[in-house]
UniProtKB/Swiss-Prot annotation:
Protein name per Swiss-Prot or TrEMBL: Probable alpha-L-glutamate ligase
Pfam families: RimK, Rimk_N
One example of a Gene Ontology biological process annotation: protein modification process
Organism: Aliivibrio fischeri (strain ATCC 700601 / ES114) (Vibrio fischeri)
Key words, A-Z: ATP-binding, Ligase, Magnesium, Manganese, Metal-binding, Nucleotide-binding, Protein biosynthesis
InterPro entries attached to this UniProt entry: ATP-grasp (IPR011761), ATP-grasp_RimK-type (IPR013651), ATP_grasp_subdomain_1 (IPR013815), RimK (IPR023533), Rimk_N (IPR041107), Rp_bS6_RimK/Lys_biosynth_LsyX (IPR004666)
Annotated positions binding ATP: K141, E178, F179, D187, R211, S212, N213
UniProt: Mn(2+) 1 binding residues: D248, E260
Alphabetized GO MF terms: ATP binding; metal ion binding; ribosomal S6-glutamic acid ligase activity
The keyword Cell inner membrane belongs to this UniProt entry's keyword annotation: no
Names of required cofactors: Mg(2+); Mn(2+)
One Gene Ontology cellular component: cytoplasm
UniProt similarity note: Belongs to the RimK family.
Entry binding sites for Mg(2+) 1: D248, E260
Native organism taxonomy: Bacteria, Pseudomonadati, Pseudomonadota, Gammaproteobacteria, Vibrionales
Length: 301
């Protein structure tokens, strides 16, 4: 098969592992920088050009689109969909999961466990907003944040009010969530492919750090999931419409709570913590599904 990987840097661990896994199975692979693509949008023959050449005859596309290029990256992916190329994750599913508020609303509508969450732009009553989520301590997030950037733990009401007011001054949309103390600064990353959890790791925040992101010095280790955690992770990925997803859970006194559903989960942490060939499993999934062009929206989204 001819597989394209939408990635801005082919030396990144995840991208290079996907290239290696695809080539070892005899596939032709090309890394495509979505920002350098340009499109011919027409009703007869939609086209994508890259480095002066038309991109043709691709069987599948693996989107590894960074958060900062979501808009243009998903537009390029949508164009591939319109050309009949099989997307590992569809453009509409990626945009759905990248919007933190939209994804929380979709998960809550389906009864998925999550921390009590408030959302605000310019609240005229910050005290009431904090009361709504159970008071301090609270976690306050900028809606556009990634890798733990723009996430603050406010341990007292006074600190929480100050942070909310500061974020409002940035004209930023903010999310206020209850702090799950019993999680102990750890979360669980469940890697879902095709409706199954194929690997899971526990990420523990560095000493004195409540954020467990590996980019922030957290550590990863193998973890055994409960049946409920497995079921929750699969349901969250399905609600987003993602074939490949990293679902982040917190262990709470009331069961697993979904923090985030990531449409472009990194492979390095999970492969090193579990010893599993996750890149190979993604290529296996493509082999089973791309031939039949099984995509729900066919570029309609």
């Amino acid at each position: 098969m001819k597989i394209g990987i939408l990635s801005r840097n082919q030396s990144l661990y995840s991208t290079s592992r996907l290239i290696e896994a695809a080539e070892s199975r005899g596939h032709e692979v090309k890394v495509i920088d979505a920002l350098r693509c340009y499109m011919n949008i027409n009703s007869e023959k939609p086209q994508i050009h890259f480095k002066g050449e038309e991109l043709v005859d691709y069987d599948a596309i693996i989107p590894r689109i960074g958060a900062s290029v979501t808009f243009y990256g998903t537009a390029v992916l949508r164009q591939f969909e319109m050309m009949g190329v099989y997307p590992v994750n569809e453009s509409v599913a990626i945009t759905r999961s990248r919007d933190k508020l939209r994804s929380m609303q979709l998960l809550s509508r389906k009864g998925i466990g999550m921390p009590i969450t408030g959302f605000a732009s310019k609240p005229d009553d910050v005290k009431d907003l904090l009361d709504m989520v159970g008071g301090a301590p609270v976690v306050i997030k900028l809606l556009e944040g990634t890798q733990g950037i723009g996430v603050v733990l406010a341990e007292t009401r006074k600190a929480a009010e100050s942070v909310v007011e500061a974020f409002m001054g940035l004209k930023a949309n903010i999310m206020v969530q209850e702090f799950i103390k019993e999680a102990g600064g750890a979360d669980i990353r469940c890697f879902v492919i095709g409706g199954k959890v194929i690997a899971a790791m526990k990420r523990q925040g560095a000493e004195g750090e409540f954020r467990s992101n590996l980019h922030r010095g957290g550590s990863a280790s193998l973890v055994k999931l409960t049946p409920e955690e497995r079921k929750t992770a699969v349901a969250a990925a399905n609600i987003m419409g993602l074939n490949v997803a990293g679902v982040d859970l917190l262990r709470s006194d009331r069961g697993p709570l979904v923090m985030e559903v990531n449409s472009s989960p990194g492979l390095e942490g999970i492969e090193k913590a579990t010893g599993k060939d996750v890149a190979g499993l993604i290529i296996d999934f493509i082999e089973k599904n791309a031939a039949t062009k099984r995509t729900k929206t066919r570029g309609k989204g």
